[in-house]
Amino acid sequence: MIMKRILTILALSLLCLTSNAQLVWKISGNGTKKPSYILGTHHGCPFTYCDSIPGLMKAFDKVDNIIGEINMIELAEMSPERMQKMQAMMMMPADTSLLSLFNKEETVKVNAWLIKELGANLEMLSMMNPMTIMVTVQNKVMMEVIPDVADMTTIDKYMQTLGQSKGKTIGELETTDYQMELLYGNSLEEQADALLEMIDLGNSKELMIQLTDAYKSQNLDTLWEIFQEQMTGYEYDAIVKVRNLNWEKQMKELL
């Protein structure tokens, strides 16, 4: 049975629930026997920032369970079969052309943007589906803003690894399969529309810099404003709205 004292680690998509200038929230009252805590994290922020989050380690010492967005320890031990399944979801189906998802005007727009961002056009990226292209560009932007992001230990992984070393139970609110379905579950046409919307939004690098700075300064009002600017409608529904509702239900059961 899951113990009642829990530290739940969630990505920034949870931050829309509050405007308080803090990253750790205490959950108590309303029938709960022992307090639990929520930690808001940023995947582009290294674990060394934990020392700058007031109350984090005190909360960590009080809990018996660490519940993450996903289990980062299991993710590092993913089987080759699961990796192949994920890679297949990122590719265009053999019977559909990436170019067929865009009209002539859209193709010109997408190609100009892709050449600027990735040095390639739709024809050169023909094996990728639109969502994979979006993720690739977003990862590139993050690496430009945070050059060592690929090698660093994130806050999520650090807290789970530390928890495991202290004998705490490690759990998750989502599986990687569920997250992949969130990203790639919509039709190719909807993914293409989301890509066009991402191009129209622009300023992704500047927004990533602002997002990281706002997180480090724990300015949640600014974080939420940036999220609203940066996210397409497709991303907001999939990454924030639906997941927050699911997390709320699960957290009530855990508490």
Label the predicted regions.
Residues 1-6:
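Positively charged n-region of N-terminal signal peptides that target proteins for export
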Residues 9-11, 30:
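N-terminal hydrophobic alpha-helix used for membrane targeting or insertion
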Residues 23-242:
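Structured, acidic catalytic/metal-binding patches in enzyme active sites
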Residues 241-255:
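A short, acidic, amphipathic alpha-helical segment used as a generic capping/interface helix at domain edges
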